[in-house]
Amino acid sequence: MINAISPFQVQNTQNTQNATNQVNNSQKTDSSNQTSFSELLKNSISSLNESQVASDNMTNALAAGKDVNLDEVMIAAQKASISLTAATEFRNKAVEAYQEIMRMQM
């Protein structure tokens, strides 16, 4: 038995083809814009350092009696603390993964 092709099936086929083309195009652009792991790590460490320095500067200004909003100082300190905790956890996971690889038998 032969079924007729409905207009909805044609539209679905065209939508699927368009989506496939978009995925292929985005994969091509993503591969050309990728940054290396070392650059990503360097940028992350730089950002972490900047947040730590900003927090220290605000804390020192507050301790020196300068006109600094306590809320902003506490928020900056918490952001720096969370960033440092995340970086420490990332380092721990990286070391753990390295140790696991070193335990593998060849």
UniProtKB/Swiss-Prot annotation:
Q: Which GO terms describe its cellular component?
A: bacterial-type flagellum basal body
Q: Where in the cell is it found?
A: Bacterial flagellum basal body
InterPro entries registered for this protein in UniProt: FliE (IPR001624)
GO BP terms: namely: bacterial-type flagellum assembly; bacterial-type flagellum-dependent swarming motility
Keyword annotations for this protein, in alphabetical order, are: Bacterial flagellum
> Which spans does this entry mark as compositional bias, Low complexity?
9-27
Any keyword Metal-binding? no
Q: Name one GO molecular function term.
A: cytoskeletal motor activity
Reading the lineage from the top rank, the first entry is Bacteria
Name of the protein? Flagellar hook-basal body complex protein FliE
Classification of source organism = Bacteria, Bacillati, Bacillota, Bacilli, Bacillales
Name of the encoding gene = fliE
